[in-house]
Amino acid sequence: MEIKKAAMAGTLESSDAQVTVEPGAQGIELSIESSVIHQFGRQIKAAVMETLDRLDVKDAKVTVVDKGALDCTLKARVECAVYRSNDVTENPVSYTHL
């Protein structure tokens, strides 16, 4: 999925993360700001990159300001920001099979 315009999801509240995506030129440019970067930086990066890969995002500038978010929250924020960048208002994945 192509990042068509800048978009943001999340807040700067405790236990949340603010994720911003912008169009990129070559690959994924990831910037992470977190008070727990030394303990959980690799895990934060993995959650973000896994979500971008699942959504087939190849070129983007991604900024994450983490305030202690869980992996599921990080993934949801990345997904939401990517969908917003494409003006997608409904999740295109069907959950009727569950």
Regions found by a protein language model. Give the residues of each.
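Compact, glycine-rich, soluble single-domain proteins
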Residues: 31-47
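Conserved bacterial/organellar gene-expression machines centered on ribosome-associated P-loop NTPases
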Residues: 43-65
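Short hinge/gating elements
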Residues: 25-35, 63-67
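Intrinsically disordered, low-complexity, basic-enriched segments
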Residues: 4, 11-13, 32, 54, ...
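Conserved small/polar residues in nucleotide/adenosyl-binding loops
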Residues: 96-97
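N-terminal basic/disordered segments at the start of proteins
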Residues: 1-23
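C-terminal structural segments of small proteins and small subunits
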Residues: 70-92
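Protein-protein interaction regions
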Residues: 20-24, 29, 81-82
